Amino acid sequence: MYDTIIINAPQAQSITISTAKAANNVEVSPDPVSQATQDAATTSTTQPLPEEIIKKRLQEQWEPKKKDNVFLSNIYIAADMANSKNKATRLRNCARWLEFAIAEGQPAKLVKTSSCHVRLCPVCQWRRSLATFRTLARVYSSPAVTRHKHLFLTLTQRNVSAAELGAELNRISAAWSRLTRRKALSCVKGYTKTVEITRNQKTGEYHPHIHAILSVPQSYGRKEYITRREWQELWSDVMHLDYLPEVHIKAIKKVTGKTVAEVAKYSVKPADYLSKSADMAKKIVEELDNVLDGKRFVSLGGIISEENKKINNGKNPEDLDELTDDDGDWIEWEKVVYEYNFGSGVYERLSV
């Protein structure tokens, strides 16, 4: 499967020079040839070439994640799991080749690459996070959404063991469904809900929890209001807990990129299972792989879901093809292909 994403070049700083002219001054037009030469020289020193931009992006973004991807592939080879060898091969081939389209004065576009779609893949997790961010940024900038107030909600419960994690994720999903049907939440007109999983490094327990952006009317706080204590009681009830869980709720003046990034981040941080010894990484991957396989961690409801249908054709924010640019204007551009060198750990340009 091929995907297309745009890599935007950093914009050159624009400098405007204002010249005050006296009434008796005569404006002299510069020689067009010398001016063109000067402009070209200025451009070459201030505007990086497309391939320079590509190399910078490869070094800063793609190569570190591909190295982690290769490490994870080796973990899957050693893992004692069904289908682990197949996933190891898919991981190794993920983003192995990157084809860019370049043209002078245009941002470089990645027009071909492959995705393994292994949930724990660092490359796919990164791209999935970008896709989620892009989708939600569009939705939350639409007039139908910006006219609402917004709340940022975090719902938690006690940690669980690795053996309990799968069942706990199912409980959380069912509890959220019950929560959204409660009369107390009739003031919530839409939401984005994501599930994040963190791991306690000392105990090895897992902490799945919900982050959500809630859209409420402008009258919220005057006519209706849900206190933090009420949120605790509601979550305890729908989760069937015998204690009051920790809950955080705060009003958001405006849904900014930072807010969207909070719900668009990785479902499981790669550092939780990659920055370990090979044996520990293998243990954690074996605990997580089957539990996370095939699960969705982002869901939309109410006006957020409706706007997503209008703006993004209803695609799930996690879909990697949200990074696809299908305008076709790059068809006649020059193509450059980079292949990952497993020995040196860098992408190298191929002759095509």
Language-model regions, residue ranges each:
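Right-hand nucleic-acid polymerase module
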Residues: 1-206, 216-352
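Cys/His-coordinated zinc-finger cores
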Residues: 212
